[in-house]
Regions:
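Enzyme catalytic cores with a strong preference for nitrogen-chemistry domains
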Residues: 1-187
């Protein structure tokens, strides 16, 4: 069963869409395109990934109040790709949906964060939550400056993901509170 579980996690490419209806007025659509890890950040797959997110977000006939994309769903760093991303988001949010997307982002000091960003019905950022518990050797090198491997690269440069300043809750336009845990923080 362990082999089957590994295969399901690593090789299954079945996209997942889950809709949660608390009542008939508020629909949450959770989208999981199941992009293979070895393709996630390759530029030649970027358009394919975006098309997949877009298609799955629009798949159901009913419009969603909130669409949720997974951690690091968008294959670019925000806000470097802000105009491109906002153009895509505006196409998805035509029915006045909001979007919660996991993404890597830079701040004004060019520090890198793993974040969840809530986009309002106009495609503008309405709130940010940053990851607080990083994965050692996956998102940062512990004690990097004290060891000879301080020049080891995680993301094609010597940049670690930082613990972000934004924590707490996000609020939708309907004043629904969203408590966000990103990946490793759930454990």
């Amino acid at each position: 069963s362990g082999f089957y579980g590994y295969w399901c996690i690593d090789y299954a490419s079945v996209p997942i869409i889950l809709e949660l209806e608390q009542n008939s007025d508020y629909v949450i659509r959770i989208v999981q395109p199941n992009i293979p890890q070895n393709q996630r950040w390759k530029p030649e797959y970027k358009d394919q990934h975006i098309d997949s997110l877009f298609a799955l977000s629009k798949l159901k006939k009913t419009s969603a109040s909130l669409i949720i994309w997974p951690e690091a769903a968008y294959p670019s760093i925000w806000p470097n790709s802000k105009k491109e991303f906002n153009d895509i988001v505006k196409k998805i949010l035509v029915n006045k949906s909001e979007l919660l997307s996991g993404m890597l982002r830079f701040d004004l000091d060019k520090k890198l964060y793993n974040s969840a960003i809530l986009f309002d019905t106009n495609g503008e950022s309405a709130g940010i939550i940053d990851k607080q518990k990083r994965v050692p050797f996956g998102e940062y090198i512990p004690l990097r400056d004290n060891f000879p491997f301080k020049n080891l690269s995680l993301f094609g440069n010597k940049m670690d993901i930082n613990i972000g300043p934004n924590k707490g809750l996000l609020y939708t336009k309907d004043d629904i509170k969203l408590g966000i845990f990103i990946c490793y923080e759930i454990s």
